[in-house]
Amino acid sequence: MDVDCAETFSQPCTPLNFNPMTPSTSRVSTPVRPSSTMSARQYSGSPFKAQPQNMEPSNSRVQELREAAVGKRSYTNAWMQGTYAPPQMAGQQQRFSRPPSVIGSTMSHMTNMSEMTAYSYGGLSMLSVNTEMGEFNNFVNQAPYQRALTRVSQVSENQDPTNRQYPMTAPEIIENLESTELINQAAAIRALEPIVKAGGMLQTWGPKGAEPIIRALFQVLIPRPVENENVIRKAFEILHHSILLSNKEIRRIDRMFFRLNAALMDPNGPPVFNVPKPYSIYEIVMTRAIQLDTKFESSAMVLLVHLCCKPHFMKIFFGEDETQQSPAHRRLHKIVIEFAIGNLRRPETKSKNKGLCVSIIKNLSNKNATIKDMSERLGVVSLFHQIMQNEVIHEDLLWSTMQALTVFCGDVKNGTHFVQMGGAQVLCGLLSHGSTRLLHELLKCLRRVSDLPAIQEQDMKESIHCIVQLIGCSDVTIVELATGTLRNIGLHNKMNKAFMVQDGVTSHAIAVLRTSEQFTYQPHANIDLYRKQILSIYENCLSVLNNVTSMAPQDIKESAVSACRMISENADSAYVLLHYFNVGNRKCRKLAVTVMKRVIETVPAFADPFVDLLGTTNEPLPILLLQRAFQSLDEWRKTSVEMMNCDGRSAEQRRELDDRRKDHEDIVKRSVGLLTNLCSQANPRFFHSLKLVLTNGTLNPFQWLTHEMSDGILQEWLAFILSICSRDESLQTFMMYRFLEQAKMTEAFFAELKARRQNSNIQTMLSKIIDLGRHQQRIVSQQHQQHQMQHHRQLM
């Protein structure tokens, strides 16, 4: 009979409408004969083909259901009347099971007898019987049944009534792991995995139970005639999670790994796992990790990278102490590095595993110089170069390789080798990658290799163009690294400077200096690091301007002149340079005054904007130059004294003192040199703004003149004094004589100073000062005598 599906509705099954004569839907009997010839054509193993075992008469199933329903009803009635007693199972542990519910369902008889569903489904379901009659609430609150109710029933529990509700003991787990039966191994894995992932290994089995479990897990990794890939994969994951946690007890688990590895490495100790010794847990894992296209390959590599790169493990097995230099340790170092580099050479190795191998090489090379030398001899730098060329779409691998390259290129030999292979150009070709973290690592490595002399032999035109485009970025780290790379890349190669000028690097650098306040409004977790980055950007941009305007003999003068003209034509350059000379640190002051001096000497018209331009503290440029010169001269003297008394200081502290002394010396020389130019050749207003503080005795240049001055400072200082005292208006006011009189200088001082100096320019200028001072003193004396005579005549 045809039944309209749209008009047929499923009815809820209740005790009132239950009819045991109705066939259950839990099992559909197969017709006696195939309904069509199509069924006859099906293959013999098809579940839809008529089989002998399901060719039973259809009425036998109905009779079976009738008998089961009668039994269910009787058991249920007995339980509702309170006369049903749960049977006591054999053994010490009592297991209580409820009778099947009168409700017909698709659940099997085994399901109703399971420990969980006997209480949860049968007792708590609204479709079941009234539980108050049987005092069910008191019954289930008795331990240990309450704990069973607190756990959510899973499908696996319903399907497997023998599934355990409590953790296995350590001996049971070890026995199951050592078993060759898959079901036993799987049971141990199911018992271990959730507890280990939750960090409860020691709390559950204690140290005495956890250590044998770890040994048994490693024994699972030893190749067997019959093994399951999923079991091996899970063993790797459990071992990985056991050393991954960072709680207080993790060191206790680490020591279990250490003891097992030490036992394997000891050639004279008792046998372990029936493997030839010396051996190690690293080799156990590597044996599995090298098996490609398996389910456990990636899990093995993840465990290996943690065993190699975890700081505590590196300290114990890969350090440089004498305890790590035994033959067994040296053998381990060699095997691990050869495995990692061999994996990089194999074309069939997955990109993820290559990235993990790169991390192993990087961390172990950082920890142990011997391992680093071993890696270099095996050609690891060339392998890194190949990865950067070929694996351009795998971000994780590129990122790990860039970190390792930065470490290895810190050595001049490796960095030079990488640059000579064209590595700098390869790195610049990846600057368009969309990953920010990869871009950071690329620029870090570029900044390091661009400081090597080997870069001057490379054609970096296209690379420079790519880097210049990045310095306008809003990312502080990218701007710092990009400007640092440009600073280094133009230091050794004159052609690189010319390429930078052609790409308009002067305008870009000034724009970054002008808009650098945008970085101060960006939120940052580490404020101190953030400030250091911003200061580094300032110094890098000013250094770039200093490099491209340099006119040393090895530089291209036309390129430097072009850079000076570009700076002079920039409307913001004067304000920017004056600002950083005024409020910057000593590095910024030194670089800013150097650039100003070069540009004004090359393009004299660049001095005009400074005539009316005031600094942040409202002083004009000449006053600022003189103030900074006096301040740096004082710092130079103090630092020189410290240098003489630094016998007990470290080499780094002495280098810092020497660097500070040189910076202050350069500030004095270039500030005074620029003042000389402004007062002798530029707009007269520069001298007039300076004349007032010179004549009132506030800043007398002779007061700072000492025998301790270096030749460089003394030459610029004397040239400045002669330039301001040789002007017509200065000669008319006898400025030289006034300075000498205020400072109480004598000819004997200048004669002694002249005798100590071998520089002919200094001797010539000292002679001019002596002659001019003597001449003006004579004129002043004559005028004074004439004034006295006139006064005497008036009195007469």
UniProtKB/Swiss-Prot annotation:
Signal peptide residues are none
Record localization: Cytoplasm, Cell cortex; Nucleus
What happens biologically when this protein's gene is inactivated, per the record?
Worms exhibit premature cell cleavage during embryogenesis, symmetrical cell division during gonadogenesis and undifferentiated intestines. Embryos show a defect in centrosome positioning that delays ABar spindle alignment and appear to lack endoderm.
| An example Gene Ontology CC term for this record | catenin complex
Which Gene3D superfamilies is this protein grouped with?
Leucine-rich Repeat Variant
Q: Mind listing the UniProt keywords for this protein, alphabetically?
A: Activator, Cytoplasm, Developmental protein, Nucleus, Transcription, Transcription regulation, Wnt signaling pathway
Q: Does the keyword Cell inner membrane apply?
A: no
Report the record's Gene Ontology biological process terms. asymmetric protein localization involved in cell fate determination; canonical Wnt signaling pathway; cell fate commitment involved in formation of primary germ layer; cell-cell adhesion; embryo development ending in birth or egg hatching; embryonic body morphogenesis; endoderm development; endodermal cell fate specification
Return the InterPro entries for the record.
ARM-like (IPR011989), ARM-type_fold (IPR016024), Armadillo (IPR000225), Beta-catenin (IPR013284)
Q: In which domain of life is the source organism classified?
A: Eukaryota
Which regions does the record annotate with the repeat ARM?
Answer: 462-504
Query: What residue spans carry the region label Disordered?
Result: 17-59
Q: Name one GO molecular function term.
A: protein serine/threonine kinase activator activity
- Any idea what job this protein has? Antagonistic role in the Wnt signaling pathway that operates in embryogenesis. When located at the cortex it has been shown to inhibit Wnt signaling during asymmetric cell division but when relocated to the nucleus it shows positive regulation. Has a role in blastomere signaling during endoderm specification. Component of the beta-catenin-lit-1 complex which promotes phosphorylation, down-regulation and subcellular relocation of pop-1. Within the complex, activates lit-1-dependent kinase activity. Can substitute for bar-1 indicating functional redundancy.
* Subunit organization: Interacts (independently of ARM repeat) with nhr-25. Component of the beta-catenin-lit-1 complex (also called the lit-1/wrm-1 complex or the wrm-1/lit-1 kinase complex) at least composed of lit-1 and wrm-1. Interacts (via N-terminus) with lit-1; the interaction is direct and activates lit-1 kinase activity which leads to the phosphorylation of pop-1. This promotes pop-1 interaction with par-5 and translocation of pop-1 from the nucleus to the cytoplasm.
Name-wise, this protein is: Armadillo repeat-containing protein wrm-1
Q: Report the source organism.
A: Caenorhabditis elegans
